[in-house]
């Protein structure tokens, strides 16, 4: 397990998609996270950055797609995503001006 000191090094960016935007109503948020981070580190980082109580964390490793270029093939970067569920009664996270 790699030790990462700053919580902002663990949480890299929110995922902006239709699916993640619709899950906000259920207090479920999706983030792109550091590939070496684990669920406990993600939970602690979310609680420190946004001052909320996290109920559960699910993670998914997404393989980068293979893409064709003029000279052959390249590959997009692989990412790790964290689907974070907030505890009931926790205040919502205002990521992109979503309705609460």
Swiss-Prot record:
TM regions (residue ranges): none
GO biological process: translation
Recorded GO MF terms: rRNA binding; structural constituent of ribosome
UniProt keyword annotation of Lipoprotein present: no
One Pfam family matching this protein: Ribosomal_L23
InterPro entries: Nucleotide-bd_a/b_plait_sf, Ribosomal_uL23-like, Ribosomal_uL23/eL15/eS24_sf, Ribosomal_uL23_CS
Superkingdom of this protein's organism: Bacteria
GO (cellular component) term, any one: ribonucleoprotein complex
Swiss-Prot/TrEMBL keywords: Ribonucleoprotein, Ribosomal protein, RNA-binding, rRNA-binding
Its biological purpose: One of the early assembly proteins it binds 23S rRNA. One of the proteins that surrounds the polypeptide exit tunnel on the outside of the ribosome. Forms the main docking site for trigger factor binding to the ribosome.
Oligomer and partners: Part of the 50S ribosomal subunit. Contacts protein L29, and trigger factor when it is bound to the ribosome.
Family to which the UniProt record says this protein belongs: Belongs to the universal ribosomal protein uL23 family.
Protein name: Large ribosomal subunit protein uL23
High-level lineage: Bacteria, Bacillati, Actinomycetota, Actinomycetes, Mycobacteriales
Encoding gene per record: rplW
């Amino acid at each position: 397990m790699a030790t990462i000191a700053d919580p902002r090094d663990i949480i890299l960016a929110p995922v902006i998609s239709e699916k993640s935007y619709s899950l906000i109503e259920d207090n479920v948020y999706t983030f792109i996270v550091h590939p070496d981070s684990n669920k406990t580190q993600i939970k602690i980082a979310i609680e420190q950055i946004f001052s909320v109580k996290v109920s559960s964390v699910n993670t998914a490793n997404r393989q980068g797609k293979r893409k064709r270029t003029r000279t052959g093939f390249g590959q997009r970067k692989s990412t790790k995503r964290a689907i974070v569920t907030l505890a009931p009664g926790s205040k919502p996270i205002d990521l992109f001006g979503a309705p609460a």
